[in-house]
């Protein structure tokens, strides 16, 4: 077949992206997403991020245990996703046949094969998620939907349980199917189960027949960003995996004392979509935003609470366009007026609100790279011991910190309010260590996207310090898809909050990767003379996120010094617009 045949059939003939390693252990490693994004992937509504560093990790892991390996080191998953059966059959059927031959050879030599699929999980906290078609429910592992469990009870309670214990001893939590259970019919892991015994594809039938005899143990290993970037967590993770799978005499381990009960009968109810919370349900993201003008540092942290919550995160905008980021997934732990997820903690201390973090952060030298997440992650490095200690002291007329949170039926629901105040603290990240003093806001996340009905929106908050008048202000404007305009402004002074009208915000950028050229706002009170707020951008980060109906949300988010007459302060700004990707114009519905 020629290149013309490749274009006509869609089957990839070039195999330069594939690296094959021959080993003597009864183990086959596969890294399906080790490539890099092609430029055209940026035009997609929701481009997939390749699993950076998994090619190198798989290569190192194979050397450590003497395993065979099939490594994708260059092919963009947005071109062909080797982890999706339909795309494999359409564009690389030979790759499926190659895996079947490799498994057959291992089984013929050793009597059984262990298949480990090496993937990347784009959460930064050092974590590993084990996919075998199940999720954990207490002491049970239950199939997701109609998934087949891809490993035996003995393998789950032996090598996999030992892997979990070895990782835990190295401060790396391991979970079963928390994020990626690998139970979908199109998932490559399911090719190594008896799910495809009746398939019309010979390679799938062969793999399923081998699995039906109990001769395949298959596992999907999802490594977080901190476990993939060069550094201590990656070294400790590979060390634990080598210890667990390196004994090739039997390829397993004696069971651990506390065993999991594995349910193998598919529960179709788990395949049904989860019920969404009602539209009237309170927003579920609470956090804090702070700006220290003298240090030129901004910080944003938030926690997801209640139904649909997925995690927590903290981002630091540092001088010279640098960014430090930590993210985590899972359920926020709530104890009174204290929220925590891993090393990130947000709590009430007396009348103050405190944020504390000690852990790894990915630091990126150029904030504009965050327009393409894969580009940002590929340029970043791991700071294994970043520290953040911040305290927000609310202004006298603001609500008591405890009022920001209320507990109801075991869930923590954020009250729809906020508290502005003065900031004090210290950070250490990306070689920078400094004390912080400035301004902050806590409460419902200021920049949450919500239902994304807007075509554009401009928002900001600013503080001016105690003794000033006003103490703080908050301005929001947006244009909806029906071209209706909405605006609100409220100002905090010694008597409390007041609503203003006649609101206008000027906040424009030359391009999605450039900071705002002009930042200002005007507002009036009962038709009186206008107040004008002028901002000078200190730092910013551009973001690109998928929106509804083939649109994409482009956001410029950052911190600025603000002046209001003779008063000086600082705060946060955001400009977002929703573009139709087909026309590159503001979306209309």
Show which residues each predicted segment covers.
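Structured soluble/peripheral alpha/beta segments that form catalytic or ligand/cofactor-binding pockets
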Residues: 258-589
